Amino acid sequence: MYVSADLIWLAVALPLAGFLINGALALWRPDAKSAVSVVGPAVLLGAFAVVALIFRSYALAGLATPHVVHLWTWLPAGALSVELSLLVDRLSLVMLMVVTGVGSLIHLFSVGYMRSDPGYARYFAYLNLFVVFMLVLVLGSSLPVLFIGWEGVGLCSYLLIGFWYGDKANADAGKKAFLVNRIGDFGFMVAMFLIWVALGSLNFLEVAELAPRHLAAG
């Protein structure tokens, strides 16, 4: 059965739905641990299944050409038009298998490990959201979209590291991780600016095509 790469958005949408459901339960039904125990891991297993089917289709068809899934134009600003698009190729599919596969195992382990914690639903909401941003980071077809994923992963790292914020050491560790990531943000934004000035594009496929010519021209 051939599964089109156009369906890769489902791999992101499923854990996003898990975040919304578990987030709502954390706010209004924090004691609904049975529902959280099902929703949290199920959305990750579903995402893994979607990725695995697309990976299998790519492998059987011997596809090597990158496939761009356009969702919508995010920033139509003259020459700089940033599209919210997902880039599917062999490398991204391998990384998606890792993210959703390992993520599923972590979610399943957490069902037992975190069961007695009063913030159970909140924890799974954060964990689902962490995977969402990891997938955006891997799938982003341009530097701005990748940057969204990067920022989201940094935010979720802060939330998860400082999850038991009642302990000062955990709260401080979360703040430290958040601040250190801001150093990376600065370098990332400077690099994006320089690439835009030099090549006039932040799209990965366009940059890969333009960069060799730019370097050859000196």
Give the positions of each predicted feature.
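...captures the hydrophobic TM-helix bundle architecture rather than a specific catalytic motif
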Residues: 1-218
